[in-house]
């Protein structure tokens, strides 16, 4: 009986130490395609300032599909084939509809998301993947996880 209790206590101690070590490593986790695929994120911040969607308006978003297909909407709908390497997301040749939006912020967001995807955006996840941050030296966009299902 003592051997069983001693074994269980040792197992718990080893497990606790291993768990603590992995939590410390989460801050340095390099985001992978698997972390992003099949998720939809809605915009919450632009360059550190909170973004609120207008009443009855669609929330600007970015979604990652199978094989890193990227789609979303700011003012216009956009889409492209993403590639994630060493925590940097790129999508060359992003396609985008070209409608005019009366909201100047949404028009600027079209340019910002296009620039981030075309030139490469550093990708990070916070709060267990609930917050997605895309950034470069000019722009930081923060999104909140809001999956369709």
Where are these regions (language model features)?
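Lipid interaction determinants
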Residues: 17-79, 83-149
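Sec-dependent bacterial lipoprotein signal peptides
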Residues: 1-15
């Amino acid at each position: 009986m003592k051997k069983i209790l001693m074994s269980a206590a040792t197992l718990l101690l080893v497990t606790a130490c291993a768990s603590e070590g992995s939590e410390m490593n989460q801050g340095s986790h390099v985001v992978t395609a698997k972390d992003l695929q099949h998720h939809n994120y809605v915009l919450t911040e632009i360059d550190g300032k909170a973004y609120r969607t207008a009443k009855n308006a669609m929330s600007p978003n970015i979604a990652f599909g199978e094989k890193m297909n990227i789609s979303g909407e700011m003012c216009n709908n956009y889409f492209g084939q993403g590639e994630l390497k060493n925590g940097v997301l790129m999508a060359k040749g992003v396609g985008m509809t070209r409608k005019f939006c009366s909201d100047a912020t949404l028009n600027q967001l079209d340019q910002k998301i296009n620039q981030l995807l075309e030139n490469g955006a550093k990708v990070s996840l916070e709060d267990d993947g609930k917050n997605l941050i895309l950034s470069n030296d000019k722009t930081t966009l923060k999104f909140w996880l809001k999956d369709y299902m």
